[in-house]
């Protein structure tokens, strides 16, 4: 599995070796991981990263059910770290984020009941 930090950096358009903004990106990723924990996704005790070592597999037991987590984390980090200039794009991203939150929460609830 790919590193959480590395994959988010790639989606943000930053090269893997460019570490200038790693501290900022890590802080934003950890904020989003906290939200996911509150939604019931990921380890119940919470999860955070400090570098490019933790992978998506470390955060998620069953990555096939939660594949959208990667997109969700990217979109939330993008809006915080490098928001689009267009208000229409921001609105569209926020709608998608809301849908991801609803779907991820539903999947987490279904997984708990099984």
Language-model regions, residue ranges each:
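Conserved short "hinge" loops at termini or chain/domain junctions
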Residues: 1-65, 98-114
């Amino acid at each position: 599995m790919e590193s959480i930090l590395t994959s988010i950096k790639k989606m943000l358009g930053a090269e893997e070796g460019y570490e200038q903004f790693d501290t900022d990106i890590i802080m934003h990723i950890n904020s989003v991981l906290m939200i996911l924990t509150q939604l019931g996704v990921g380890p119940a005790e919470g999860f955070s990263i400090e570098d490019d070592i933790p992978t998506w597999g470390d955060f998620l037991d069953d990555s096939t059910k939660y594949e959208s987590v990667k997109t969700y984390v990217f979109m939330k980090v993008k809006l915080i770290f490098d928001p689009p200039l267009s208000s229409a794009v921001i609105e569209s991203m926020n709608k998608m984020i809301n849908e991801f939150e609803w779907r991820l929460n539903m999947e987490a609830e279904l997984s708990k009941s099984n």
